[in-house]
């Protein structure tokens, strides 16, 4: 069992139609056909959307995505029209809202890996390959991959697992031309992101991108980009291959839920418990730190304080 512990009730805004409630984002349509994406403070782990939120998380994700869209705009166009909430939207939508072009989404999670960890490490340990890409022998948790590899996955619904697939499987389902285009753009975006992050003392271990077709038939970058929710960021100064790496994402939440302290059994059908304040505060601080280190901006420019 998985999904929402407490599924939120959509906000009613004049002129907007609620379309979907995701793990983190709520999606609405305007009367003129644009999409409105609102990033909440919800957090997910182990396929559950947890009952505890991380304050300001949605604003940090949105503002970081906007910054990255600017850094990547010469590689591929993106779906953003505006970051101004529609008229009549709640005050809380400020800083966490994107008005976007409506796209025909490609049903593939486009994952790039520059370091071996997570599900990629598990697959490599079992088979010597990740998503059909053979890798050298002797790699360990945290090993750097040069060149980075493209490891796509099918996109799952809330509460379901994404399925890692090979490039050949993507080609069979969607055509070889699109498969190769997705691979090329994903790796180009990853390489740019890795270079920028390393200059700021952060390793971009892996990340995922989503793409869609616009009305002109052009491939466009969509959703969130290079955030702690879609990526693994590691402090460069603490990187030590052969062990789990310290991270700027929600790993502290996963660790607590997996600990005896939480009292939660992942294999049961029991929903996960609320997070303690210390875990919430630590997670929030990590999101703020990675935002500020990457962008060079302070979080208070979108009304976020450190306390």
UniProtKB/Swiss-Prot annotation:
Keywords, ordered alphabetically: ATP-binding, Ligase, Nucleotide-binding, Purine biosynthesis
Major enzyme class: ligase
InterPro entries documented for this protein: SAICAR_synt/ADE2_N, SAICAR_synth, SAICAR_synthetase_CS
Catalytically driven reaction(s): 5-amino-1-(5-phospho-D-ribosyl)imidazole-4-carboxylate + L-aspartate + ATP = (2S)-2-[5-amino-1-(5-phospho-beta-D-ribosyl)imidazole-4-carboxamido]succinate + ADP + phosphate + 2 H(+)
Keyword presence, Nucleotide-binding: yes
Pfam families: SAICAR_synt
UniProt family annotation: Belongs to the SAICAR synthetase family.
Alphabetical list of PANTHER family matching this protein: PHOSPHORIBOSYLAMINOIMIDAZOLE-SUCCINOCARBOXAMIDE SYNTHASE
Name under which the protein is recorded: Phosphoribosylaminoimidazole-succinocarboxamide synthase
Protein's organism: Thermobifida fusca (strain YX)
């Amino acid at each position: 069992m998985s999904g929402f512990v407490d599924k939120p009730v959509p906000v009613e805004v004049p002129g907007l139609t609620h379309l979907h409630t995701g793990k983190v984002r709520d999606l609405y349509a305007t009367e003129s056909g644009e999409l409105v994406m609102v990033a909440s403070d919800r957090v997910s782990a182990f396929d559950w959307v947890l009952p505890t939120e991380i304050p300001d998380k949605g604003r940090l994700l949105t503002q970081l995505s906007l910054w990255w869209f600017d850094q990547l705009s010469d590689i591929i166009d993106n779906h953003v029209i505006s970051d101004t909430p529609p008229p009549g939207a709640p005050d809380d939508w400020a800083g966490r809202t994107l008005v976007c072009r409506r796209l025909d989404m490609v049903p593939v999670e486009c994952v790039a890996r520059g370091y071996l960890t997570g599900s990629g490490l598990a697959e490599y340990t079992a088979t010597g390959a990740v998503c059909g890409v053979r890798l050298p022998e002797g790699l360990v948790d945290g090993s750097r991959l040069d060149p980075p590899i493209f490891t796509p996955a099918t996109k799952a619904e809330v509460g379901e697992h994404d399925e890692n697939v090979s490039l050949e499987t993507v080609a069979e389902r969607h055509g070889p031309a699109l498969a190769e285009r997705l691979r090329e753009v994903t790796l180009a975006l990853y390489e740019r992101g890795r270079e920028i992050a390393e200059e700021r003392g952060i390793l971009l271990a892996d990340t995922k991108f989503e793409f869609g077709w616009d009305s002109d038939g052009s491939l466009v970058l969509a959703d969130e980009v290079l955030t702690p929710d879609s990526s693994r960021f590691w402090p460069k100064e603490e990187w030590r291959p052969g062990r789990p790496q310290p991270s700027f994402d929600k790993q502290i939440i996963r660790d607590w839920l997996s600990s005896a302290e939480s009292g939660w059994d992942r294999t049961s059908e029991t929903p996960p418990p609320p997070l303690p304040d210390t875990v919430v505060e630590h997670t929030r601080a990590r999101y703020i730190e990675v935002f500020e280190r990457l962008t060079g901006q302070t979080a208070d420019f979108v009304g976020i304080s450190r306390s």
